[in-house]
Amino acid sequence: MQFSSYRDLREKLLAREMSCEAVVTAYLQRIEATRDRNIYISVFYDEALRQARSLDRKLDAGETPGKLFGMPMAIKDNISIEGTGLTCASKILSNYTAVYDATVIRRLKEEDAVFLGKVNMDEFAMGSSNENSSFGPVPNPYDSTKVPGGSSGGSAAAVAGDLALVALGSDTGGSVRQPAGFCNVVGLKPTYGRISRYGVVAFGSSFDQIGILSKNADDAAAVLGVIAGNDGSDATSSHNQVPDYAAEMEGVSLRGLKIGIPKEYFPESLNSDVASVIQERLDLLRSLGAEMIPITLPESDYAIAAYYILTTAEASSNLARFDGARYGYRSEKSSDLTDMYVNSRTEGFGEEVKRRIMLGTYVLSAGYYDTYYKKAQQVRRVFLNRYREALANVDVIAGPTSPFPPFGIGDKMDDPLEMYLADVFTVPASIAGIPALSVPVGFDSSGLPVGMQLIGNFFEEGKLLGTARAVQNAGKV
């Protein structure tokens, strides 16, 4: 029992061709049969079936089904669901149970979505391969020796492997888009503030944004329409009205669409297979009426440096709360309070998390604040202005999601800088706070997925999703 889209599933459910319970049971059986893939951290067997039966009774009673009626979803394990574990794939939160629902979870429940479980991720969303997890790595659905990307690797692998129809992830610098590209699914990072962050464990608070992973743009739009919007519990959530994304998508046509092509996204170092697949799809889009406009984003080389200064600074502050005193893991080796703090954090955090905390503490220190943090904030403003200039003349910006295809498990773990470069094309949009997504466009010579990143203007997710649908459908002609 597999579905190409939520529309397909919804039609069958409402026509009573199948029950919610049968659909959820099929997904749970597939999840159980693939537990060795390490995709799910926890599976809500009883609760998911309870939800499904409740929805079947709702339909029997003639009640109006919600907008996401019966949608089987996976949730990244840094998003709070009351009464369930919230580990962030970290030992330091191994015994923590969430005490409230994130705003997005509450909104999804109100529209009848079904939660199958919590999925694996890089610890505290810090990573590009899903290898920085206390639960171990997740294999790529297309080659079990390769990574699925990160940090939302479990979310992407769940959708690609038909272990959820749609998944929620979080994107700080590419953590939805890069795994989407590696796993051949759509991955959307909306405009910063479009979706409430209340109930999401913070990594970089001025970057973090909940994202959506799905098989197609229409499903992402359906979920976005439900979870987007202002939230009084999140001061950074936008007051901009939530539009009808489906209607906005219908207004997008390839004919006359202006696509900006930044030369900086096609360096000589770009993997040749990735370059070939992306160029082939761009040529196809041109043949269907799209206009390719060369643009330049000259500050792109500074993106990784600025991003890792700013996000680690925020992380060093955000993660100070995990100290073993109030909740989570507590070391038993401590002789006094100071020892307890030090040992709990030393034993509870993984190596990459500790590396970023130390880097963030360093750049915020009195002697280096102006040299690093303040300078990086100035660079961030330059990025914002540069994207505004570029997007004033084009509808979207296109390029590769990642500079290389999925790499082998363990290949980059000993070289953090090489790992960070996996996000070299996704980080700039995060710095600027603008929406971006990855859409599948083909495979390399080894049969591994290649994703195309599309970047749009503030709050133009509808145009972005409409373009993604056109790009994806163009490959089916």
Swiss-Prot record:
Checking Gene3D superfamilies in the record gives: Amidase signature (AS) domain (3.90.1300.10)
What enzyme class is recorded for this protein?
ligase
Alphabetically, which GO biological process terms does the record hold?
A: translation
Instruction: Show the GO MF annotations.
Output: ATP binding; glutaminyl-tRNA synthase (glutamine-hydrolyzing) activity
Catalyses which reaction(s): L-glutamyl-tRNA(Gln) + L-glutamine + ATP + H2O = L-glutaminyl-tRNA(Gln) + L-glutamate + ADP + phosphate + H(+)
Q: Which GO terms describe its cellular component?
A: glutamyl-tRNA(Gln) amidotransferase complex
Top-rank taxon = Bacteria
Q: Which InterPro entries match?
A: Amidase, Amidase_CS, Amidase_dom, AS_sf, GatA
EC numbers: 6.3.5.7
Pfam families listed in its UniProt record: Amidase (PF01425)
Catalytic residues (UniProt) = 76 (charge relay system), 151 (charge relay system), 175 (acyl-ester intermediate)
Annotated keywords: ATP-binding, Ligase, Nucleotide-binding, Protein biosynthesis
- Summary of the function given for this chain in its UniProt record: Allows the formation of correctly charged Gln-tRNA(Gln) through the transamidation of misacylated Glu-tRNA(Gln) in organisms which lack glutaminyl-tRNA synthetase. The reaction takes place in the presence of glutamine and ATP through an activated gamma-phospho-Glu-tRNA(Gln).
Subunit structure, briefly?
Heterotrimer of A, B and C subunits.
HAMAP family in UniProt: GatA (MF_00120)
Q: Which family does it belong to?
A: Belongs to the amidase family. GatA subfamily.
Query: Which NCBIfam families does UniProt cross-reference here?
Result: gatA
- Its name, as the record gives it, is Glutamyl-tRNA(Gln) amidotransferase subunit A
